[in-house]
Amino acid sequence: SFVLNEKVGPVSCTISQKGGAYKANFVLPKLPTFQAVEPDMDLLGRALGLARNQIGLPGHNCSVCDAGVPYPVVPLSGLKAMGDIKINAQALGSCMETIGRLAEVYVYTTECVWPDSDYHVRMFSPAFGITEDPATGSAAAAFTAHIMEIEKPKDGQQNYVIEQGLEMGRPSRIELKLEVGGGRLQQAEIGGQAVIVAEGHLRL
């Protein structure tokens, strides 16, 4: 175990090993916040390259969630909508400007590819030069606030699995552990395994 000193605060990290694979779990240094928002839906459709009926899920709102880094969160109708996304960066910037955010978006649906997943997500951030990210831990951390608001989980430990990066051919699995008490989030952890995608040496 060790602590990472990040801008958001000290992040406790625990490394474990099982079957030759290593797993890291991080405790969120601050509880995430949730703010329901209503972006311009016509602009949002243009930004995502989707029809209006592909955006949204019954009982799910658009939001901005923040666990140190704020993310606009948008529900989509299913896996087909997720696969149909064609980002228009200019329209995305105009759309997110209406809710005071930059050109980035974290989209999700409850229809999943893997049977043990709870959410299928994609993250686009042209504002920061990221066409698409295969695994976004900071967004998953923020998304715990959205889960609390939408699902209203019962007290105790609640576990969720997020799948991401499948459309990119770089699948990732992010695990969330929520400690709920009195109907409120008391603590949250994110975790997962990693594989080497690049390596090298620094000459000092």
Regions found by a protein language model. Name each.
Residues 1-204:
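Active-site proximal loop and beta-alpha junction motif in alpha/beta enzyme cores
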